[in-house]
């Protein structure tokens, strides 16, 4: 069964089209059921390949997407070919017809396009990347004017289910404390990753 995909409405130029996959459909089994796209979590590579090919077929892509090897870093790379072995958590391209992919579970998937539609980028943003400035570094590489960007922030772990400790609080509180809420336990907070990203983007202009 093909992986179910849904089109993203995010205000990007008409020539920029984005989709996200769901857990419906696909060939992965067990804990990975059923539409896992990652080759780095222990799933059967053949099943992952089928899942990826399902999306390529449905979207009638001329080129395979660029998949990053995501490592929870703040590294930004330029993508030039589907065969690029990009070890990073953010990439961008100016090559027409070259799709970019970002994988996420608890972390934030962020899509970015220039207003003229000549450049696109993706960011995989967890707390480590956000604390290390991945959004700021991406914008510095991507655009001279942050106001020239169209941004979509995708789904991530719900704040009620995301509890962090003092070490993470200390790192992210340098940005703001608005995205934390206290838990019943001493030294523990709920963290709203999406709110973190929104505050950083607002600070960047």
Placement of each model-derived feature along the sequence:
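Active-site microenvironment for binding and transforming phosphate-containing groups
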Residues: 1-205
């Amino acid at each position: 069964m093909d992986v179910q995909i849904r089109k993203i409405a995010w205000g990007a130029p008409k020539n920029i089209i984005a989709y996200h996959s769901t857990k419906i459909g696909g060939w992965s089994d067990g804990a990975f059921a059923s539409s896992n796209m990652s080759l780095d979590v222990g799933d059967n590579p053949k099943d992952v390949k089928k899942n990826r090919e399902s999306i390529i077929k449905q979207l009638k892509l001329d080129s395979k997407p660029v998949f990053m090897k995501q490592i929870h870093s703040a590294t930004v790379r330029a993508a030039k070919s589907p065969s690029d072995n990009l070890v990073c958590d953010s990439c961008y391209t100016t090559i027409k017809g070259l799709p970019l992919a970002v994988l996420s579970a608890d972390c934030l998937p962020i899509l970015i396009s220039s207003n003229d539609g000549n450049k696109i980028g993706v960011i995989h943003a967890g707390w480590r990347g956000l604390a290390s400035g991945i959004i700021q570094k991406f914008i510095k590489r991507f655009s001279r004017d942050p106001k020239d960007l169209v941004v979509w922030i995708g789904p991530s772990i719900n704040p009620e289910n995301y509890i962090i400790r003092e070490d993470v609080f200390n790192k992210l509180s340098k940005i703001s404390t608005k995205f934390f809420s206290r838990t019943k336990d001493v030294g523990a907070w709920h963290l709203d990753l999406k709110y973190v990203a929104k505050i950083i983007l607002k600070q960047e202009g």
